[in-house]
């Protein structure tokens, strides 16, 4: 279950009484219930994350899943597939920003279980409204415009619920790109704690 588009992926060799077994690093970490969203949110990455969430739920429905995010965002539809699955599965999904959680990446970061949403100290978080392009006849453009406005309303409502901010504040802050430090994201309610070391968890 390797994230796509990462080039060379290191292998880990484990030895046991039954011999050796090689895993790519992400498959090995999946055994520890760690999932990664690295790079853009698209159908391919969303399908991988959804499959891994469902797999880990089937393995143990009572043990937390850790979801590491380093993503500039991407497709709203693909991101909503991940979001809905995070809410659907029984285990708590803990989120951690490593590097950048922008756009849909920030939305998914905030969607983790309350009290279990983290950021590393030098990570950056960015929220904004969904964007899209439309072409074709005027009626087609009108349909697309309505869809993007509906998506913006839905995303803002969920973000308000997850952060404790008002809908009005979310609407203002997502009007343009709003970048935040890890501490800013903590104050805003996107994360619950900034972690400098593992023992801080």
Swiss-Prot record:
Listed GO MF terms: ATP-dependent peptidase activity; ATPase binding; serine-type endopeptidase activity
EC top class, as a word: hydrolase
Subcellular location: Cytoplasm
Protein's UniProt keywords contain Protease: yes
PROSITE patterns for the chain: CLP_PROTEASE_HIS
Major subcellular site: cytoplasm
Superkingdom of the source species: Bacteria
CC annotations in GO: cytoplasm; endopeptidase Clp complex
Residues forming the catalytic site: 103, 128
EC number: 3.4.21.92
Catalytic activity: Hydrolysis of proteins to small peptides in the presence of ATP and magnesium. alpha-casein is the usual test substrate. In the absence of ATP, only oligopeptides shorter than five residues are hydrolyzed (such as succinyl-Leu-Tyr-|-NHMec, and Leu-Tyr-Leu-|-Tyr-Trp, in which cleavage of the -Tyr-|-Leu- and -Tyr-|-Trp bonds also occurs)
UniProtKB keywords: Cytoplasm, Hydrolase, Protease, Serine protease
Gene Ontology BP annotations: protein quality control for misfolded or incompletely synthesized proteins
InterPro entries per UniProt: ClpP, ClpP/crotonase-like_dom_sf, ClpP/TepA, ClpP_His_AS
SUPFAM superfamilies: ClpP/crotonase
PANTHER family with a match to the protein in the record: ATP-DEPENDENT CLP PROTEASE PROTEOLYTIC SUBUNIT (PTHR10381:SF70)
UniProt cross-references to NCBIfam families, sorted A to Z: clpP, PRK00277.1, PRK12553.1
HAMAP family: ClpP
Function field: Cleaves peptides in various proteins in a process that requires ATP hydrolysis. Has a chymotrypsin-like activity. Plays a major role in the degradation of misfolded proteins.
Similarity comment: Belongs to the peptidase S14 family.
Summary of subunit composition and partner proteins: Fourteen ClpP subunits assemble into 2 heptameric rings which stack back to back to give a disk-like structure with a central cavity, resembling the structure of eukaryotic proteasomes.
UniProt protein name: ATP-dependent Clp protease proteolytic subunit
Organism of derivation: Bordetella avium (strain 197N)
Name of the gene encoding the protein in the UniProt record: clpP
């Amino acid at each position: 279950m390797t994230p796509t588009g990462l080039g060379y992926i290191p292998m880990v060799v484990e030895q046991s009484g039954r011999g050796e077994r090689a895993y790519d690093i992400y498959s090995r970490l999946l055994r520890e219930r760690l999932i990664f969203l690295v790079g853009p949110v698209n159908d391919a990455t969303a399908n991988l994350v959804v499959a891994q969430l469902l797999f880990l739920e089937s393995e143990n429905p009572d043990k937390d899943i850790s979801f590491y995010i380093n993503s500039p965002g991407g497709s709203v539809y693909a991101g909503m597939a991940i979001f809905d699955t995070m809410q659907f599965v029984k285990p708590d999904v803990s989120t951690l920003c490593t590097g950048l959680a922008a756009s849909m990446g920030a939305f998914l970061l905030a969607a983790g279980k309350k009290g279990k949403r983290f950021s590393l100290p030098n990570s950056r978080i960015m929220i904004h409204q969904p964007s899209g392009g439309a072409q074709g006849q005027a009626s087609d453009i009108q349909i697309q415009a309505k869809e993007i406005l509906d998506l913006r309303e839905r995303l803002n409502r969920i973000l308000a619920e997850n952060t404790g901010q008002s809908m009005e504040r979310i609407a203002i802050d997502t009007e343009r790109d709003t970048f935040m430090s890890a501490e800013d994201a903590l104050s805003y309610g996107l994360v619950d704690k900034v972690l400098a070391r593992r023992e801080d968890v």
